[in-house]
Amino acid sequence: MSSQENNWQKNLSKSFLGFQKNRRLEEVECIIPDLAGMSRGRSMPIYKFTPDTTFSLPISLFYQTISGEYVDMDIANQWMEKDIVLRPDMETASAVPWADDATLQVINDLELSDGGPLKIAPRNILKNVLSLYKKENLKPIIAPEIEFYLTQPNTD
C-alpha cells in the first residue's frame, strides 16, 4: 500500500490511534443501521478501503426482520435486488475493541445509484427531521432513560 493510499489513516481520531498503538490496521467494518436499528454491512481488508470508495449492498436488507427472515410485502419489483450505495462517513470512524485485530468501524450514509439519498435509510430520515427543526429555529433535545428493575431473589 502506497503512503498516499494510507494517508487518511493518520487523520483518524486520537482515541482510535491510541487504541491501535503500533498494531497494523487489518480490517474495516462498513456498517449501516437497518429499520430496526440492527447493524448491517460488510467487512473488508484495509487494502480494499479508502474513505472515497463507495460500496454496494442489496436493498433487500431493508426487508429483513431482526430474526433474519423476510417481510411479506406487496411491493412491485421487491426482489429485483437493486443495489444501494454505502458512502463512508469518516467522522464516525471508531475502534472495535472486541475484535482480535486492530479494526476500524465506519458508519455509512446510504444513497441510490444516481447519488440521491435513500429516503428510507434511518440516518437520512434523521437528517431530514433535523433539517425541519433547523428551519423552525428549534433544537431537539433527547432524554434517554435506562430502565431497570430491582427485585428480590425468587427462592422457589
Residue ranges and their predicted role:
Residues M1-D156:
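ATP/Mg2+-dependent ligation/transfer catalytic cores
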